[in-house]
């Protein structure tokens, strides 16, 4: 994290003192996304839910990170669920792209990792979709909440999982437990 922040500070220092006319502006410019990410990552790390951990495989690329959610209650308690997040160049006008890397039996996450979470949608009919005022903290808290209060059987992406829950809650729980033992340890 400090590497990109150091780069931003260095670049800010170069603004007033252009030493070479041959140096292009593009080598000095830092994207709006990257400036926002330095601030948001610091805020995120200070305000993570206790059930979440963030990992940056490359500290110079704050736009690519992994999130681990380890629910401490509900159906998914005891599992560790990995999410991959990529923040596009057009951030914060568009939401980050998030995929669940852990196979899971969940009404709002497909077995291939697609996620149904309003704030990850650029356009949402319920008015809770992405807005430029949202931050990575909102995304992380939203993903964490998919395992508790945002678990939604009434508006599923994985219809089969939602119908399974409706048909037989105990068997649904058994299948969730099986997936946790097999894929989320």
Curated annotation (Swiss-Prot):
Cite the SMART domains for this sequence: UBCc
Q: How is it modified after translation?
A: The acetylation of Met-1 increases affinity for DCUN1D3 by about 2 orders of magnitude and is crucial for NEDD8 transfer to cullins.
Q: Where is this region: Disordered?
A: 1-27
State the reactions this protein catalyses: [E1 NEDD8-activating enzyme]-S-[NEDD8 protein]-yl-L-cysteine + [E2 NEDD8-conjugating enzyme]-L-cysteine = [E1 NEDD8-activating enzyme]-L-cysteine + [E2 NEDD8-conjugating enzyme]-S-[NEDD8-protein]-yl-L-cysteine
Write one Pfam family the protein is assigned to.
Answer: UQ_con
Involved pathway(s): Protein modification; protein neddylation
Described purpose of this protein according to its UniProt entry: Accepts the ubiquitin-like protein NEDD8 from the UBA3-NAE1 E1 complex and catalyzes its covalent attachment to other proteins. Together with the E3 ubiquitin ligase RNF7/RBX2, specifically neddylates cullin-5 (CUL5). Does not neddylate CUL1, CUL2, CUL3, CUL4A or CUL4B. Mediates neddylation of the CUL9-RBX1 complex.
Q: State what protein this is by name.
A: NEDD8-conjugating enzyme UBE2F
Question: What gene name is given for the protein in this entry?
Answer: Ube2f
